[in-house]
Amino acid sequence: MRRWLRSILVLLVCTLSVGAQAEDMLMVRSRAQFEESMSALQEAISAQGYTLSRVQRVDIGLSESGFKTDKYRAVFFGKPEEIRTLSARYPELIPYIPLQIVIFAEGDETLLVAANPMHLRADYADAELGAVFARWEQDMRTIMEQVRKAE
């Protein structure tokens, strides 16, 4: 009986830890084609009050490495004044800003993937930054959900 309970406990802990790790990434799948999803992503970013910084093609390097993909982009965005302020106050945040969402075609659908900004909270005890990370997470979820709903 004791062994059985221990096994259940180990299984429960493993299940919970996998769920916690999954929250490090935000991901949605859109039924829309890549072009429509890319357009919806740019509109959703703007609607949330962010400025599109740049769109970087990732597929070129992948193709040169032998992978077959023709629609793979990293979309960078942020609020310019916020980026300047945070970069000056917290230079160690520079690698994480501007925010980014990766968008790529998979068959007839499009996937969007991003690192959850809340994972940064573990490294910063500052309550002000915690609020910023929470807002970024909510905004990214909203942006990605708008793209998911786009047809």
Language-model regions, residue ranges each:
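Terminal, regulation- and interaction-focused segments at domain boundaries
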Residues: 21-53, 145
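C-terminal partner/receptor-binding element of secreted or periplasmic proteins
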Residues: 118-151
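Positively charged n-region of N-terminal signal peptides that target proteins for export
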Residues: 1-6
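Stable alpha-helical elements in mature extracytoplasmic
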Residues: 37, 41, 54, 58, ...
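Bacterial N-terminal signal peptides
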Residues: 7-17
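Beta-strand/loop substructures that line and gate deep hydrophobic ligand-binding cavities in soluble
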Residues: 100-126
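Compact, glycine-rich, soluble single-domain proteins
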Residues: 46, 50-99
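Active-site-proximal beta-strand/loop segments in catalytic clefts of secreted hydrolases
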Residues: 31, 78, 115
